Amino acid sequence: MRLEIRNLKLEIGIMLFALLFFVPVIVCAEALDTDGDGLSDEDEQMYYTDINNPDTDGDGYPDGLEVKNGYSPHKGPGVQMHQNDYDGDGLGDWLEIWFKSDIGKIDTDGDGHNDFDEVMRGFSPSEKDGEKKFRRWIEVDRSRQRLYYFVNKIKLLNLAVSTGNPWTETPKGDFEITKMIPEKSYVGADYNLKGVKWNMLFNTGGYYIHGTYWHNDFGIRTHSHGCVNLSTQDAGLLYKYMDIGVPIRIYGD
C-alpha cells in the first residue's frame, strides 16, 4: 500500500514538472506598427495611410492620434473624418467605416453601384447579395423646419423645408410613402402650380413632399397648404433614393 502511494506521488510530481516546463507559453504579440504612429500596419491599410510615414498628410499630427480623435489622416489640419471622402464616391470616410465599406474603393463589393448609392437605398455596400440590410425612415421636424433622412440610425440627409402654415398645417403622426410622381400640378382656390417635380405622397389626404420653385423660405418659415416643401434640387435627391413604403414621422409645433 505504501509503495502504491509512493508511486502515485512520483507520477503526480512528474506531471506537474511537465506542466511547468514543457507546456508551450502563448505570447500575445503587439500588432506591427512599422512607423510607430499608433496605427497598426493592418489599420494603415484600411485607412490607406503610409505605413512608413507617421504623419501621412504632413499636418504635424501622427496618423494614429488623428484617427483616434476622429480626424482625417489624409487632409489636415482640422478636417474631420466625416468631412473627407478619400475615394470620392459621395460617402464620407467615417460613414465608410461605419457601413463597413472600403474608403479607397468607389464600389466596394464590385456590383456596379457605388457605395453612396447603395447605402442611400438601404443596401450593404460590401455585399453583393442584393438584399436590403438597413432600415430607412424620414423625419420632419415642424418646429425646426427640417427634414431628416436616416439609414441604419445614421442621419444621412438634413434638409431645409417649409411645412404647412398654421391655418393649413402639415399633419403630425406616422405615415409612409404611398405614391411617387415625377411631375404634377397642384390646383386650389388660390393657387395653380404647374410642373412641380419630385412628388412623394405620404397621406391619403393628398399631402406630399415635393420640390418647390415659387419661394425660397426653406428652413425659415412655414409656407404651404400642408405639403412639405423642399427646394427642387433637394427634392430630387430625396426622390432618387426613395421607395414606396418608407416610413415618415412628422412632429413638432
Stretches found by the model and what they are:
Residues I51-N53, K105, I138-D141, Y148-F150, ...:
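Structural recognition of the beta-strand scaffold that forms the well-ordered cores
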Residues T108-G110, F116-D174:
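Cell wall/extracellular polymer interaction/catalysis modules
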Residues M1-V23:
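Short, basic, low-complexity termini and linkers enriched in Ser/Thr/Gly/Pro
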Residues G130-K133, W137, T168-D174, E183-D253:
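Exported/periplasmic cell-wall-interacting domains
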